[in-house]
Every structure is written in C-alpha cells, then in structure tokens.
C-alpha cells in the first residue's frame, strides 16, 4: 500500500440559497473538498466520505512531506487501501459551519461584510447532506457507489440513504448511531457551556476582540476526548501513573492522564473555532431521523434502497454497539441487504480511526464487492438498486 502523496484542496462557490431545516437559509457559500482517484467514464465509481466533528475534507494524502499533514483517514483511503483509490473516485467535503475552509462562522456574512460569528445559522446533518448533494450535482455525479462515514460522518451517510435513496448504492456506517442518547446530549451541553461561559467568548463575537475562548475550548475537548477513549484503553495507557513519581499535594498535574487530556485540550484550542464547535455539537444533538416517524426507525428506513455495511466496536461507549444493532434490526425488518461486524477492540470510539486488521479487512472485503458490481459491468450510469 502506498500513500496518495501530495494532494490539493478544491473549492466550489454556490450562489443559489440553501434552505435549512431551521427555516433560515445560507446564501453565497463555498464548499471545500478534495478528490482522490479517477472518476470512470460512466461516473459509477464515486464514493463520498463524510467527516466527523473535528475532521475535514482532508481525508487522505498529505499537503507536504511533513507526516503531520496526512489526512485523518489516510489509513483507510488510498492506493491499495480498504477504500482503494486505484478503483474508486473518492470525495471528501468540508461541511458548512466548519473552520477548515467551507463557509462558516469565521467567514464574512455577505449582508454585513463582517464575520458571521454567532449569527451563522444552526445547521443540521440533513442540511449538510443537502449541500453535499449540490456538490455532487456540480461534479456530474448522479449516484454514488457508496456514501461512507464514521461517528458523525456515519450519521450523514445514514441521512443520505433516507433523503436521497436513489443516489447511493451502498451506505457504510461506522461507529455511529441513529440518534444521541440523553447521556451524549448531556456531554455535548457541558462542553458547550465551557465555551459559552468563557469570558473570552464575548457572545460569539470574539473575532472583533482579537481573542479566542481557549479555556472553554480546552475543557470542551478534554471532556469530549474522555468519551472517545475506553476505560480499558485508559487503564493500559495511563492507569494511575504519576507524572513525577510522587504526589505534588496541589491542584496541578499529578497523573499522566491529566497531562494527556490537557495536552489534547491545548492542541485543539490552537486550531479549532469555538463557534464551529457549538454548531457541530448541536447538529449531533438534533440528529434523529425517526422523530418524524413517531420514533419508529423501521418506518424511517423503509424507503431506503441502498445495501448497508455497519461496523461497531465493543468498547465504544460514546456510540455503543447497541446503537448499531438498532439500525441493523430496522434494516432487516425492511428486508434490506445489510452486513454487520462488531469488532472486539479496546480503543473505544476512536477505534474507527485506527489500524485494526479485522476492521480494515471487513471494510476492504465490502468495497471489493462494491467494485465487482462496477467492474463486472452490471452497472450503467444512473443504475439504481
């Protein structure tokens, strides 16, 4: 397996207003994206990869020789990798409201010429999917071979199967959920409160004050990071190890886990936008496609037409395997073709980003099947399942 090498982001401007679930709309917006591989003649080999909370369009490859610039899913996407760019044309899109290039709170509001800040409209998973569909239209892709994502990205993939059932043949949902539990919403709210109560937040207009609510971002990230790890993984990595070998009898850093979380918080506060964090966690909280169907997930998924791959991880307590079981059962109730794997992995929610041989083998085998449909000539442009 080799790397994609140096990749370059692209952008596309849209002047047609995008209506949002809230009733608001976004006008004059830009989506930043990257593509890997080659689109075949009938456009049947395109795969959309949707990103999670703090990720972006930069799925794979690098921006320089510096390894730190590698994409967030470089182990998954590339030549000879599970999602093989020698076979598929892969697209990564940065979602609206993000801080990595697509229009978001940091960008100028056309109506005022000043940063949107807290005036940027609340967006939902469904809004992101609508914007991604517009990008697909502009790229000449009527139907994806697959739409794929992990965590929040998996929610977007699921939403694609509901909103545009005819526009994807396969839906790959990894370490995800059909809705957040009360516990998950509680974690998100505490994280938001850390930001909202930071004196440097200034009601979201901190750009004008030349400051960043770093303390709030630090705490939000520290809290979030705890939910991405498993108790088993934390015990192995950190246990009760002391940073200096003995108690300091103060309120500084005693334990290695404290040092690790503060490092993660400090790093996050240097590159992520606070208003974006608020927006994305709200999108997480609001995602509940079964809400309009009386909470019945089977009814919600009754109009889907894709085939599905779902993967969960045994120690993921952020989006536990039970959440994937719910989706699998609803799909089976609808007699949909579904492949499911629960990986016994110790790394918690973050396992979906890591190199577990069993996990990678499952995804690789599934995409080999997807490719056989294309390469075997059974599909024509616009073919539907």
Swiss-Prot record:
It is found in: Cytoplasm. Pathway: Amino-acid biosynthesis; L-methionine biosynthesis via de novo pathway; O-succinyl-L-homoserine from L-homoserine: step 1/1. Keywords: Acyltransferase, Amino-acid biosynthesis, Cytoplasm, Methionine biosynthesis, Transferase. InterPro entries: AB_hydrolase_1 (IPR000073), AB_hydrolase_fold (IPR029058), HAT_MetX-like (IPR008220). Its main location: cytoplasm. The record marks 318 as: Important for acyl-CoA specificity. Residues 45-355 form the AB hydrolase-1 domain. This is Homoserine O-succinyltransferase. The gene is metXS.
